[in-house]
């Protein structure tokens, strides 16, 4: 009879544990990155009254007689299903769409989390502002004048250098991929200024030297009076004539020749121009600068000047220089690349956020602050970039909500409550039976 008392006690204790887990799930229903827990029960050892016997010629076999001695908690699992995303419109708020974890560092210790409410501290580190832990990834490094992110190197603290300067870069090339309207009228001798304006295609482009001084390129193009599909171009720098050249097109509107020299299909037609850069002071003449005008590829319509009966365009004209600028803002793309946005219009890759994965994420241990730590049963951490081995993508401007389903938790709460009540009834009923035994003495 005493066994039923202890079975009831084990039921009370373990249903209380289950209620604790359910209560914690409900408490964290609005905790970003939280992963719900689940309690599984199993029965305890059973006491054997008699063992099983095998069949004989005279009798059949018998089954064992066993009395269970209660139950205990088999496991308390952490369920790592994807939570829904909540939009925040804040660039440093991040969520993972996939199985990866953000990596945080405190001293020499690494922690892993799905809670991506990050910010930039006074030292310009990307951190979790709740505890100061630093987000890990890879910073871009200078390689032959270009910023390169080496994801094969060790992870490090990520720095977002708000306010840093980006030096000026001199213009080396001006690339044209615009259209000259074949319908433009010819400019006859003695034409009026209005007729000249109607028959001239004009484009202006700012050019930069290594100090950020600006010179203005003006290109004026008119139809040749005598030769079909031929255009005469004049280059002006800062209002002064610099050079002249001619452009020829085939009968299908594609670029064909430069200065009367026909090119082979696929040839790039370009012409250098040299000029004196305007200095910073009025009247000051700077050093000479040479800029290459890339007019296009012979026979190409996509990356060349063309001649079609459509409006002349100036949109597809690009120069590769810029003045000095300051980093004003940043954004993070779905690959985890942190892109700096500068006041001079330049965008620079600053670094990349690393993600971690585990063979058995259920083996991770919760360490507080919605963080996890590696254990002997989680498997060793595997660190990589987004998109690899199921790590998933990074979403900027969102936070992952808890994966707690309140309807499920309330149902589990009711079942747990009834289980607790039933075990309590087992104890009170066993107590009544003991009282009957005591009364037999009287």
Regions found by a protein language model. Name each.
Residues 30, 398, 441:
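Conserved functional loop/turn residues at catalytic and ligand-binding sites
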Residues 433-442:
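Structured functional modules or segments
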Residues 423:
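Acidic/polar, glycine-anchored loop/turn motif associated with catalytic or activation segments
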Residues 426, 430-434:
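Short segments within alpha-helical structural elements
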Residues 2, 35, 39-403, 408-412, ...:
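Small/polar low-complexity and glycine-rich loop motifs
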Residues 10-17, 32, 401, 411-414, ...:
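Alpha-helix capping and helix-loop boundary segments enriched in small/acidic/polar residues
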Residues 1-39, 43:
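N-terminal intrinsically disordered, low-complexity, charge/repeat-rich segments that act as generic
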């Amino acid at each position: 009879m005493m066994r039923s008392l202890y079975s009831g006690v084990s039921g009370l204790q373990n249903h209380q544990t289950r209620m604790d887990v359910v209560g914690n799930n409900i408490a964290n229903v609005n905790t970003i990155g939280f992963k719900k827990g689940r309690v599984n029960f199993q029965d305890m050892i059973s006491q054997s009254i008699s063992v099983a016997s095998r069949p004989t010629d005279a009798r059949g076999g018998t089954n064992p007689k066993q009395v269970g001695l209660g139950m205990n908690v088999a496991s308390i699992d952490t369920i790592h299903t994807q939570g829904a995303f909540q939009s925040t419109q804040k660039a440093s708020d991040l969520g993972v769409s996939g199985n990866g974890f953000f990596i945080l560092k405190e001293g020499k210790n690494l922690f892993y989390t799905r809670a991506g409410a990050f910010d930039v501290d006074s030292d310009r580190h990307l951190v979790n502002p709740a505890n100061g832990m630093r987000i890990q990834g890879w910073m871009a490094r200078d390689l032959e004048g270009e910023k390169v992110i080496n994801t094969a190197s060790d992870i490090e603290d990520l720095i977002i250098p708000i306010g840093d300067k980006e030096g000026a870069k001199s213009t080396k090339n001006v690339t044209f991929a615009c259209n000259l309207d074949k319908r433009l009228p010819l400019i006859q001798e003695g034409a009026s200024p209005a007729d000249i304006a109607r028959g001239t295609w004009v484009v202006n482009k700012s050019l930069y030297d290594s100090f950020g001084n600006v010179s203005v390129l003006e290109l004026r193009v008119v139809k040749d009076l005598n030769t079909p599909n031929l255009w005469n171009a004049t280059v002006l720098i800062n209002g002064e004539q610099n050079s002249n050249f001619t452009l020829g097109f085939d009968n299908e509107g594609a670029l064909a020749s430069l200065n009367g020299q026909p090119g082979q299909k696929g040839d790039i037609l370009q012409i250098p121009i040299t000029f004196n850069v305007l200095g910073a002071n009025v009247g000051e003449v700077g050093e000479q600068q040479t800029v290459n005008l890339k007019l296009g590829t012979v026979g190409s319509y996509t990356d060349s000047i063309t001649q079609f009966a459509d409006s002349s365009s100036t949109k597809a004209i690009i120069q590769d220089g810029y003045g000095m600028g300051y980093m004003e803002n940043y954004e993070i793309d779905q690959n985890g690349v942190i892109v700096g946005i500068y006041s001079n219009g330049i965008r620079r890759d600053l670094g990349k956020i690393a993600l971690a994965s585990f063979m058995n994420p259920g083996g991770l241990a919760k360490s507080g602050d919605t963080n996890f730590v590696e254990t002997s049963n989680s498997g060793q951490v595997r660190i990589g970039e987004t998109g690899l081995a199921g790590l998933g993508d990074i979403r900027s401007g969102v936070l992952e909500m808890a994966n707690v389903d309140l309807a499920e938790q309330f149902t589990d709460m009711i079942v747990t409550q009834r289980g607790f009540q039933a075990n309590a009834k087992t104890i009170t009923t066993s107590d009544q039976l003991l009282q009957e035994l005591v009364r037999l003495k009287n």
